[in-house]
Amino acid sequence: MLASGKLIGFVPTKDSRRARDFYEGKLGLRFVSDDEFALVVQAGPSMIRIAKAKDFKPAQYTVMGWEVADVEATVKWLNQRGVEFEKYPFVEDRELGIWTTPNGDKVAWFKDPDGNVLSLSQHVR
């Protein structure tokens, strides 16, 4: 049952206007709706509910990510739109913030305006 269901992501925000500017304006996701509980955007076949929270502490780990065909091109595109990537100490590509894992996968991390850690990944098959 769940294997064929559509995945819905959830992230919290304290400021839905700022979140919409980021997720729609900078990430290029399609706006779906905005009500008293959540802002909703569409990412491919997946829905992301950006829950309106009065108080929360963002997690220090990745809460949501996207698998992309070319992580370097996507990082550059997002940089042009004002998205800054995290430069963790273990990341060897200090310019773009892309980490290459021991098996060759590539990962880059960034934060939304509320401090939620998001990621891009490109996987070798």
Where are the predicted features?
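Vicinal oxygen chelate
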Residues: M1-L2, W66, K76-R125
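N-terminal beta-strand motif that seeds the catalytic metal site of vicinal oxygen chelate
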Residues: M1-R18, M47, Y61-M64, S121-R125
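Core segments of cupin and vicinal oxygen chelate
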Residues: F10-I48, A53-D55
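Short amphipathic alpha-helices within nucleic acid-binding modules
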Residues: F22, V71-W77
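Short acidic/glycine-enriched loop/turn segments that link adjacent beta-strands
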Residues: D35-F37, P58-A59, D93-R94, N103-G104
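Short, charged/polar surface micro-motifs in flexible loops or helix N-caps
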Residues: P45-M47, F56-P58, A69-A73
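A short, sequence-level motif marking secondary-structure junctions
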Residues: A53-K57, V124-R125
